[in-house]
């Protein structure tokens, strides 16, 4: 029997959480990939992830602002990220 089928819910959630954090790290290491390109190619972007994060928090009775959700997804305050990404794009 497959390990995934017999895995308890806690381990499954732990793996999903670790995978999500790895996705965020992957995106963070590729700041040059613009949200519009992600949206065109994958149908979602960093802003979508932050909105989904906020929506899931709300379902669980946790109030997270747009800026707080974006800070979690972007790994820094959103305005700081926008400034850095504009510098990266100009450099490229």
What annotation goes with each model-predicted range?
Residues 2-92:
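Domain-level signature for proteins that mediate thiol-based redox and metal-cofactor handling
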